[in-house]
């Protein structure tokens, strides 16, 4: 007996998946040369360069809280991703064109706001495209999402350091800028195909609520499901998977 045909993703997913790969290329490409740039071109001691990188990474990890609040209460996920992506591109261009400590500070600030603010919304917005009565398709979506993240990040680790060494920081940092501009363009091209849930105010299954639930119920997390599994006692699987995807992106 022939097996049932495999469910297809909605057309919107192809735009979001390639947007994610390009965004991750831009982020990991930029971070792969950040410390080297601080030491070799700005003349910073290595320990100070590492501290700078750590502060930048901390800002990126903090911004998902802000990005989630903005999306839930004000702009919705679509417009949050769209507008923060413009700042993200501007951050890359600032570092590429303004070769100084001040340029790096401004650029890193814009990138932290863009990357961190988009982080909780990109995977959740992709999940918005999948009907809730198709949980198997949602699981496949997050597998695809993780794959696209790996494609973008792995490609950047080879391409960007090589370009930096061969052509200098302007091309090295300019390449992630082009990648992020491409990510924004792909996202915008698919705009008419997206399901766009409006902002609804604080969600009962929001990012912070799921994390808080996971911490409270960590002892009840199913074996092999990671510490976030405890949140399944209070939240649906799609909400927990959305948060899990954020940490995969990090």
Q: What function would you assign to each model-found segment?
A:
Residues 54-72, 154-156:
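Central cavity-lining transmembrane alpha-helices of secondary-active solute carriers
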Residues 117-133:
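Intracellular juxtamembrane helix-capping segments at the cytosolic ends
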Residues 1-11, 133, 161-250:
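Intracellular loop-helix junctions on the cytosolic face of multi-pass helical membrane proteins
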Residues 1-27:
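Cytosolic juxtamembrane N-terminal segment immediately preceding the first transmembrane helix
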Residues 38-39, 70-74, 159-167:
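Interfacial helix-cap and linker-helix signal at transmembrane-aqueous boundaries
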Residues 73-86, 133, 137-138:
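Cytoplasmic membrane-interface "Motif A"-like loop-to-helix N-cap segments
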């Amino acid at each position: 007996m022939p097996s049932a045909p495999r469910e297809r993703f909605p057309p919107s997913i192809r735009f979001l998946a390639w947007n994610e790969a390009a965004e991750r290329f831009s982020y990991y490409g930029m971070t792969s040369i950040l410390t080297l740039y601080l030491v070799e071109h700005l003349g910073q001691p290595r320990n100070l360069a590492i501290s700078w990188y750590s502060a930048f990474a901390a800002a990126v990890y903090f911004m998902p809280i802000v990005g989630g609040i903005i999306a839930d209460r004000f702009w919705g996920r679509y417009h949050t991703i769209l507008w923060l992506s413009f700042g993200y591109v501007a951050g890359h261009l600032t570092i590429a064109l303004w070769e100084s400590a001040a340029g790096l500070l401004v650029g890193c600030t814009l990138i932290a706001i863009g990357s961190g603010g988009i982080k909780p919304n990109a995977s959740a917005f992709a999940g918005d495209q999948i009907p809730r009565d198709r949980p198997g398709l949602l699981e496949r979506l997050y597998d695809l999402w993780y794959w696209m993240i790996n494609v973008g990040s792995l490609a950047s680790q080879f391409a960007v350091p090589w370009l930096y060494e061969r052509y200098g920081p302007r091309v090295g940092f300019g390449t992630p800028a082009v990648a992020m501009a491409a990510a924004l363009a792909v996202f915008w091209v698919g705009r008419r195909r997206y399901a766009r849930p409006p902002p609804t105010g604080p969600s009962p299954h929001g990012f912070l609520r799921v994390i808080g639930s996971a911490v409270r119920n960590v002892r009840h997390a199913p074996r092999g499901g990671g510490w976030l599994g405890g949140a399944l006692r209070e939240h649906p699987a799609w909400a927990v998977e959305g948060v899990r995807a954020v940490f995969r992106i990090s």
